[in-house]
Amino acid sequence: MTKKYNIAVIGATGNVGRETLNILAERHFPINKIYAIASDNSLGREVRFGEKILHINSIKIFNFHDIEIAFFCAGSNVSKEFIPKATSCNCIVIDKTSLFRADNQVPLIVPEVNLSTLKEFNTKNIIANPNCIVIPLVVVLKPLDNEIKIKRVVISTYQSVSGAGKAGMDELYNQTKSKYVFRENNPKKFPKQIAFNLFPYIGDLNKDGYTSEETKIAFELNKIMGNHFKTSVTSVRVPVFIGHAISVNIEFSDKIYAKDVEEILQDADGIVTISNNNGLAYISPIEVVGEDAVYVSRIRNDLSKDNTINLWITCDNLRKGAALNSVQIAEALINNYL
């Protein structure tokens, strides 16, 4: 008989929390009891779990004593305050914030890439879910690096407003609506107007001129892949509700052609490749909403530099970029260690 687990989803009313509940139900995760948890501001609200309706529990008074796996989908401040309470009850935490990603005692996991490091979870009973850009990036880069070592990667990201939470989506919606009725709607969540606009600024600005998002992406990429190639990142916020896109320029240590890259990625887990057969052979963010795969298109040789490939990645940032990856971690956890 399959063992069933007691599960808690913290931040259950947010974008990633709701998607986590959806995916747990879709994939028939073996659940005994499931709890939807959020701040007191969400008390009285309900969320769906498959055909069931869950009432919100307050994080302030929730007892993790009987919980075996907890998905933390709220902000870093919530994780900082409540993850120690969860782990003190022998609960295993899968944290989707950036709080523990740089901790050498906490594995940073993308199941298609570095599942072997999952065994290190029991040092702190915490597993970190990577950044929503890093997940699709390493899914694509790892199988290529396995074939021919990568020397350098130049990354430009085009990140939807859902990466900034429900408040980001609301701001894009309200600003767009206001523009059509000639009404002012000043930025609150973002530093500048996001409707009909984009800006190369996500997070805070560091002294070196890079933003905190760009620094996180470079750090996490090297932690997962191994620090053997150089990385340059520019992160752009775009007026798209859901779906991230990434333009990637990859320099390899030896000769490689676009057809080689396409063949390697066709055999890789979690990837759908689109051949350059016609003018519409590319995938845009809106086309990947609700999809689990990482899509790769516009694969081509860089005409300005030898041994270098350009390609275009698109991914649903709420699914594989966040919720799906964490559920896949939990599935690997129960199949191999619990």
Curated annotation (Swiss-Prot):
The record lists phosphate as bound by: 101, 216
- EC nos: 1.2.1.11
**Which terms are listed as keywords in the entry?**
Amino-acid biosynthesis, Diaminopimelate biosynthesis, Lysine biosynthesis, Methionine biosynthesis, NADP, Oxidoreductase, Threonine biosynthesis
Q: Which Gene Ontology MF annotations are present?
A: aspartate-semialdehyde dehydrogenase activity; NAD binding; NADP binding; protein dimerization activity
What reaction does this catalyse? L-aspartate 4-semialdehyde + phosphate + NADP(+) = 4-phospho-L-aspartate + NADPH + H(+)
Q: Which GO terms describe its biological process?
A: 'de novo' L-methionine biosynthetic process; diaminopimelate biosynthetic process; isoleucine biosynthetic process; lysine biosynthetic process via diaminopimelate; threonine biosynthetic process
Could you confirm whether the keyword Manganese appears in this record? Answer: no
Show the SUPFAM superfamilies listed in the entry: Glyceraldehyde-3-phosphate dehydrogenase-like, C-terminal domain, NAD(P)-binding Rossmann-fold domains
EC class name: oxidoreductase
Assembly and partners? Homodimer.
Q: Name it.
A: Aspartate-semialdehyde dehydrogenase
